[in-house]
Each structure stands twice: as C-alpha cells, then as structure tokens.
C-alpha cells in the first residue's frame, strides 16, 4: 500500500486508533451526545404514559425575549387584530339609537311617572329584532336583575338602556386600556398608564387650560392615585379589571363634561384646580427651590402641627433621595393624609406607626408617638393630657381582637382609624378631637343664630 494513501486515511480519521487518548473537549462532546440521545429516548418513551396530558390545556405562554423581534411583532399584530375584532363586536352610536327606538316602540303601558316600561315578552321581541350584537343583553338573567317591584312584571326601559350603555362603555374602555398593555398580561405598568392618560388629556375639555409644560406633573398626579389605592403591595402594576371596577376612571372621564360645576371640580382629584392645588402646595413647601422637600420643609404641611417623631418615620420608611422627598413620594403622603378613612391610606400610616415592624401597635408604640404630642402641647402653653387616658380611649374606640395589640385590620374594622391616627401624629388633629364636644356646641349655637336672623 502506498504510504501516501495510508497517511491520507489517517488524517481523515484521526479518532480510529483505540490506543489514542481522547482530548477533554472530545470527551465532553461525546458525553453531551450520549446525554442528548438518552434524554430524547426517555422523553419520547414517557410522552404518552398519561392520557390526561392530552386534555390538560396549556396555561403558560412564554413572553418573547427582547432579541426575539419577529415573535414580538407577531404578538403585537395578533393582539391588535384581536382588539379590533372585539371593538367591531360592540354597538356603535347608530345601533344604540336603533335599540332605543325599538325599546320605545315596544313599551307596555301604564307608565310609572315618566318611566316607560317593557314586559318580558316584548323584551324578547326587541332582542330578536335588534340584531346579533345585542343578543348578550336580552337574557332572562338581565331581565331578572332589573326587575324590582312592578306589579305587572315589567322593567324600566331607561334602566335597561343605561345598563347596555354602561356595558358598552366598559368594553370600549377595556379595549382602550388593553392597547397600552405592552405585555398583554391584563395589567398596566406605571409607564403604560402614564401614556394612556397623556393621550387622554386632549379629549378632556376641563383640562384645556393646562399648560403643556405642566402635563408631566399632571400625569404623575393622576397616575399616583391609581397606584396608591390599587397597588397596595407596590408591585408596579395594576390589573385592568381593577381599574374598571373602581370609580377613578369615572372621575377622570367626568372631565369631558364642559359644564362641570366648580364644586365637582374641587372634589375631583383629577381636575385641573385639584392638580394645581397639590402641585402649588409642593412648590410653596420647597423653600430652597431644589425640587425636593426636606423634613424641615415638609413640617410646614397643612397646619404645620405634625410631630417631628412622625416626620422622622416618614423619611425613614418612604423613598427619599439624599434624605429629601420628591414629588411622587409627596403625592403618596398627601393621598394618605387626605383619605385617612380608606384602607390603603391607613396601611400607609400604620406602617409608619409600627416602629418595631411587628405588624401591630402596642402600648409602647402609642406612647412613643403621643409623647411628641405632649411635648408640642407644652411648647404651645397647653396642659399635657395623660397618656393613660388617651390610650384607654384608643383601645375603647378600636376594640381590637387582642386587648393588648391593635392590628391594621382592627383599625379598618373599627371605622375609627382616621381618628386614632390623627390623635397620634398631629397636634391640631388631637386638639380638635379633645375639644369635639365644645366645637359641636359652638356650631349648634352659630346655626341657631343664623336661624334667628
């Protein structure tokens, strides 16, 4: 045999010599090949061991990674097509007008006041004539839900039509919010909700007077209310269902009304006067004009009678930057103090009062905060009130399950959480509570004087 042929065959098959020691990389490759082979055989062998595997629906869908551009585009397009289809299934204005015409045509006398009524038989007739889009509304369940005490077994046409309108609005709003749900998981992140509200501003006549430079502050003010109350665990996202279920979106969309009263605007957190008020307070507190609030600056909030002990806890527990509070953190603080009856606000304040992080307030916690109230009373020339008396009053008001501990749930259940927290953190609030009987008597005297005049 020609030595050239032998050498050529040897170079072409370097691993044929059984005496040759394999390299570390070759051993790893061989091990991986064997693992892949045996794993595939094992997996294939187990695939059909349980027939139920075929009927269990898939419940996990992996989201495309950032580098999977095609999958992301496919997901976005499919969601857009799905939402467009859902939108087309909703009643438009013309179809709603036609529905109202059919309901009015099939009303059954006598009317109740000015309310037109319809019985179940005609209700079903209207459902047949109204078209397939309306079929979901013309069910026995809906009729029974709206049936009250009418002796003829009828329902109010107006109530039914309002029900349909509300359902259509909810579905429209859900579709609108879902367009901003980037992940497609049924919730909105803070940035998603910010984009939604920012694009909503031009459609709200009551916000026409806002300068564009203020838009970012307005959006921050609006979004914080949603997240403060609907995201108590601070996960950074809110379910779209929760947004629809609460009244905040109604309050926001109320600003579409060009003739909204001044009183309604003042009580609506999302109105321009309210947003400007909150931001104006922040600017007034910011004496050094650095865009942040120090503890000393925040101490002038409201009546400037909050205790230093409470303010210390605010800056210990809340997110700060070099010991100063930004506007977003300030908004949480304001929402908590202005809504002390709400569970989310009580949760915020309770965390500050729970200095030992035990999940409850004991006599030590109450005394720790009330001593600061007593010190302020001395500074203002008032006689300090006995802590023992105040402690007994607090436990009497709350009536906790454990007679020595007050939990957050105890505060919420008692409906006295706002009073208890005010007593412990604000001298003016404590003074108002302590003199409540005199203040009530004074109000009665003033009202009597007005009646006499």
Curated annotation (Swiss-Prot):
Induction: Up-regulated upon B-cell receptor cross-linking. Transmembrane segments: none annotated. It is found in: Nucleus; Cytoplasm. Pfam families: EF-hand_13. One of its GO terms (biological process) is T cell homeostasis. Ca(2+) binds at residues 286, 288, 290, 292, 297. One of its GO terms (molecular function) is metal ion binding. Its main location: nucleus. The keyword Manganese does not apply. The keyword Cytoplasm applies. Keywords: Calcium, Cytoplasm, Metal-binding, Nucleus, Repeat. Expressed in all tissues tested including heart, brain, spleen, thymus, lung, liver, kidney and testis. May regulate MCM3AP phosphorylation through phosphatase recruitment. May act as a negative regulator of ABCB1 expression and function through the dephosphorylation of ABCB1 by TFPI2/PPP2R3C complex. May play a role in the activation-induced cell death of B-cells. This is Serine/threonine-protein phosphatase 2A regulatory subunit B'' subunit gamma. It comes from Mus musculus (Mouse). The lineage of its organism: Eukaryota, Metazoa, Chordata, Craniata, Vertebrata.
């Amino acid at each position: 045999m020609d030595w050239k042929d032998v050498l050529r065959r040897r170079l072409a098959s370097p691993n044929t010599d059984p005496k040759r020691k394999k390299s570390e990389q070759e051993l790893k490759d061989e091990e991986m090949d064997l693992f892949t082979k045996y794993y595939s055989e094992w997996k294939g062998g187990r695939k059909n061991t349980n027939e139920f595997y075929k009927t269990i629906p898939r419940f996990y869908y992996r989201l495309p990674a950032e580098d999977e551009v095609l999958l992301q585009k496919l997901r976005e397009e499919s969601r857009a097509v799905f939402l467009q289809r859902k939108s087309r299934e909703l009643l438009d204005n013309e179809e709603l007008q036609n529905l109202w015409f059919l309901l009015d045509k099939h009303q059954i006398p006598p009317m109740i006041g000015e309310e037109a009524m319809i019985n179940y038989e005609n209700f079903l007739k209207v459902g047949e004539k109204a078209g397939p889009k309306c079929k979901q509304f013309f069910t026995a369940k809906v009729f029974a839900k709206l049936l009250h005490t009418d002796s003829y077994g009828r329902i109010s046409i107006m109530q039914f039509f309002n029900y349909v309108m509300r359902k259509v609005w909810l579905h429209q709003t859900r579709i609108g919010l879902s367009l901003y749900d980037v992940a497609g998981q049924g919730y909105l992140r803070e940035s998603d909700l910010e984009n939604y509200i920012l694009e909503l501003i031009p459609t709200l006549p009551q916000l026409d007077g806002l300068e564009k430079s203020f838009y970012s502050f307005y959006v921050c003010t609006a979004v914080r209310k949603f997240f403060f109350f609907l995201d108590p665990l601070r996960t950074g996202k809110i379910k779209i269902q929760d947004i629809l279920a609460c009244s905040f979106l109604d309050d926001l969309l109320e600003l579409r009304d060009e003739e909204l009263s001044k009183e309604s605007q003042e009580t609506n957190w999302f109105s321009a006067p309210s947003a400007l008020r909150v931001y104006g307070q922040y600017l007034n507190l910011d004496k050094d004009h650095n865009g942040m609030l120090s503890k000393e600056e925040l101490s002038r909030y409201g009546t400037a009678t909050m205790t230093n002990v409470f303010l210390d806890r605010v800056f210990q527990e809340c997110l700060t930057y070099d010991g100063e509070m930004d506007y977003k953190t300030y908004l949480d603080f304001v929402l908590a103090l202005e809504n002390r009856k709400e569970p989310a606000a009580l949760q915020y304040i309770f965390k500050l009062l729970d200095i030992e992080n035990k999940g409850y307030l004991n006599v030590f916690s109450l005394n720790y905060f009330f001593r600061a109230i007593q010190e302020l009373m001395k500074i203002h020339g008032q006689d300090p009130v006995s802590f023992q008396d105040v402690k007994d009053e607090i436990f009497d008001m709350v009536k906790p399950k454990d007679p020595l501990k007050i939990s957050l749930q105890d505060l919420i259940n008692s409906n006295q959480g706002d009073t208890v927290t005010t007593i412990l953190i604000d001298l003016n609030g404590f003074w108002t509570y302590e003199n409540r009987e005199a203040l009530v008597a004074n109000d009665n005297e003033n009202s009597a004087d007005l009646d006499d005049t």
